[in-house]
């Protein structure tokens, strides 16, 4: 089965949003998380991936994971954590695709100790954020706090990534920062179905004449 690693938002261990996991798993994924509430530097995601790559033979998951079809997703601080997990750790090369919801923008992430370089992203990447004030305050993020994931910073991240990499950016109209897990859920699921399983319906959301 394809596997998805989930990197937590600030102060949000996996147990605090437990229903998210079986819902995503119902689409045919093994969904993995941890209890780290400060996951922005990607370290605990990397440690958790190491554990999953070395599942004990007596585990119920032994022999069940398709290690060639693994994705990673993260929200807010966890968005920065997902990028860091992919780009700053050796085992990050095992991931096939990534999604982030309202990932902390670069300056904010750097100030918080979660520095990342989007130019190092080499796998298909779907980035989403909201248009609400908590994600984009309207202020210049280079001169002050611009919200967690302002449009200008998202565009800058997008442009840093090679055009040879499949990349998608989107904004959820009217969505505030804390709403992005729910507002982006269907699109995130479609992205992972497309990237990890080749699902044609998922692909049609992003490619083709009727793509959204």
Task: List PLM regions with ranges.
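The feature captures the conserved acid-bearing segment of alpha/beta-hydrolase catalytic domains
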Residues: 93-181
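Surface-exposed patches in mature extracellular/periplasmic domains of secreted proteins
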Residues: 34-36, 57-64, 198-209
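Short amphipathic alpha-helix adjacent to the substrate-entry channel of hydrolases
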Residues: 15-34
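Active-site signature of alpha/beta-hydrolase-fold catalytic machinery across serine-
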Residues: 19, 84-88
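Hydrolases whose catalytic domains are alpha/beta-hydrolase-1, hotdog thioesterase
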Residues: 81-85, 109
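Short beta-strand element of the alpha/beta-hydrolase
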Residues: 1-9
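Alpha/beta-hydrolase-fold serine-hydrolase catalytic core, especially in secreted/extracellular enzymes
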Residues: 164-165, 173-212
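Gly/Ser-rich "nucleophile elbow"/oxyanion-hole loop immediately N-terminal to the catalytic nucleophile
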Residues: 1, 43-80, 88-92
């Amino acid at each position: 089965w394809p596997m998805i690693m989930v990197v937590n938002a600030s102060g949000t261990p996996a147990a605090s949003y437990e229903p998210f996991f079986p819902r995503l798993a119902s689409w045919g994924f093994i969904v993995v998380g941890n209890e780290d509430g400060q996951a922005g530097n990607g370290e605990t995601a990397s440690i958790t991936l190491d554990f999953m790559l070395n599942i004990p033979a007596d585990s119920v998951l032994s022999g069940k994971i398709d290690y060639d079809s693994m994705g990673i997703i993260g929200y807010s601080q966890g968005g920065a954590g997902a990028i860091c997990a992919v780009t700053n750790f050796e085992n990050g090369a095992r991931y096939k695709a990534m999604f982030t919801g309202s990932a902390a923008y670069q300056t904010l992430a750097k100030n918080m100790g979660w520095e990342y370089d989007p130019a190092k992203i080499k796998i298909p990447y779907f980035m989403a954020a909201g248009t609400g004030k908590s994600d984009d305050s309207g202020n210049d993020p280079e001169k002050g706090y611009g919200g967690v994931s302002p449009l200008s910073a998202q565009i800058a991240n997008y442009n840093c990534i090679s055009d040879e990499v499949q990349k998608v950016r989107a904004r959820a109209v009217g969505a505030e920062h804390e709403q992005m897990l729910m507002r982006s859920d269907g699109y995130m699921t479609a992205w992972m179905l497309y990237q990890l399983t080749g699902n044609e319906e998922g692909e049609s959301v992003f490619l083709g004449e009727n793509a959204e």
